[in-house]
A protein has these predicted regions:
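Acidic/histidine-rich catalytic cores of soluble enzymes
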Residues: 148-237
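Acidic-and-aromatic substrate-binding clefts and catalytic sites of carbohydrate-active enzymes
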Residues: 41-45, 64-74, 93-102, 124-132, ...
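Hydrophobic faces of well-ordered beta-strands that scaffold small-molecule active sites
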Residues: 32-35, 63-65, 87-92, 118-120, ...
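N-terminal export signals
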Residues: 5-24
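Acidic (Asp/Glu)-rich catalytic clusters
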Residues: 52-57, 71-88, 102-114, 139-148, ...
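C-terminal segment of N-terminal export signals and the immediately downstream linker at the start
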Residues: 20-46, 54
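Active-site acidic/histidine proton-transfer and metal-coordination neighborhood
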Residues: 95-183
């Protein structure tokens, strides 16, 4: 798909920029959100209002939810508004959440809460047909969500680039024939870990990256992530670092790109890693 075809999508990713839903996009500098799973040990166990205020004080522009802890849309909107944060998005997984009444319910909730996007955080299938059907389902959901002005994305883990069918990655089975409105939310760590290049994967589907998860490479040791949570700091086993600068340089001219999302899941008990990584990334953009 070339740039002209992308721009002709109307209410595809380009429309979110044209409508300037995200004011930072029009200004040039893209905003930074924190994926709240990064602080899952404290997010809902302490005072959420104080935690949100602390996130804002670091400099973050928004947050991406990983569950709502039973709060209503109005309560979520108030938390965001009181802290001066934007609701960048929410990770919501499960096929039923992207079809029929389940999809409508989610889109209505996100709209009321002031949350800007919806992302499937996990999927796994045992054959090529399963991945293709998932891509079709998600593409149809993305087309429907246009009426709510909410982009829908799929987030990757390592297995989408480790499962290969007749020479085709599972990730590509999701995207190559699905609606061009369906967005990819690449996780930099889980692109680099299987041995791929983040920029090359972004180039594969131009104009289909509303957001990206910026996370340092997480080599595995004994089945567990083996990193220290800090961008630019080599993991204990000396694994390859993510090329954050190269990624930022490429995304500076990517049509439809709207949000950086920092994730640092190895330090969930405090905001220390979130603070360090915000400083690291903000200096690049």
């Amino acid at each position: 798909m070339n740039r002209r075809e992308f721009l002709q999508l109307g209410l595809g990713a380009s429309a979110f920029v044209a409508g300037c839903r995200c004011p930072f996009c029009c200004a040039g500098k893209k905003p930074i959100a924190l994926q709240l799973w990064s602080i899952n040990k404290v997010m809902w166990k302490e005072d959420p209002a104080k935690t949100f205020a602390d996130i804002k004080a670091i400099g973050y522009d928004g947050v991406e939810f990983a569950g709502f802890n039973g709060l209503s849309a109005k309560q979520i909107k108030k938390l965001l508004g009181d802290a001066g944060l934007r609701g960048m998005g929410a990770h919501i997984s499960g096929d039923k959440e992207y079809t029929g009444d389940g999809l409508k319910k989610n889109l209505d909730f996100l709209t009321e809460a002031g949350i800007e996007s919806m992302t499937s955080a996990w999927a796994d299938y045992n054959d090529a047909d399963g991945w293709k059907k998932f891509g079709d389902l998600m593409g149809k959901a993305a087309d429907i969500a246009v009426d709510w002005n909410i982009p829908i994305s799929v987030h990757n883990h390592c297995h989408e680039f480790k499962k290969v069918y007749d020479g085709v990655y599972a990730w590509d089975l999701i995207f190559r024939d699905s609606s061009p409105r369906l967005q990819q939310q690449l996780d930099t760590s889980q692109v680099v870990n299987p041995g791929l290049d983040v920029v090359e994967r972004l180039k594969k589907y131009p104009g289909r990256s509303f957001s990206i998860h910026m996370k340092e490479n997480v080599p595995m040791k004994h089945g567990l992530p083996n990193d220290n949570g800090y961008f630019g700091v080599p993991p204990p086993d000396g694994g390859k670092l993510v090329d954050f600068k190269g990624t930022v340089d490429y995304l500076a001219n990517e049509p439809g790109f709207s949000w950086y999302v920092i994730e640092c899941e190895r330090k969930p008990e405090s905001l220390d890693a979130a603070r360090f990584n915000y400083g690291f990334l903000s200096n690049l953009i």
